[in-house]
């Protein structure tokens, strides 16, 4: 029985841990880690410091924007502006199993930006008018992490 308990812990821990982050970031407004409600983008205007502990080892030269997406009722559209050709930007989507289920970057889409439909489990949509790409997650909650390269402290207003 000990081996089964150990295996269950190893299997389930990432999901429980990520849900804990979801709760601190988007549900419990009294948490010191609280960012914004579900389906709302929170933008940081600074790079990560050692005090930022909810997510392990974020980049120290890319301010982050966060959004916990709740796909239980319906899909969501994330709109991204055109990307500057010389600046690293990315949108990474992470499901509750901690798998990356989608990436939007200049390498995957070019620098033009666009509207991206994020759908949860069970949605059977292949195309949608005005949507550049459809990204499907196997879980009903998805973490959207936006990264924008910072070219030094004087560049903060640009990101």
List the model feature ranges, each with a label.
Residues 1-159:
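A compositional/structural signature for long, glycine/proline-rich flexible linkers
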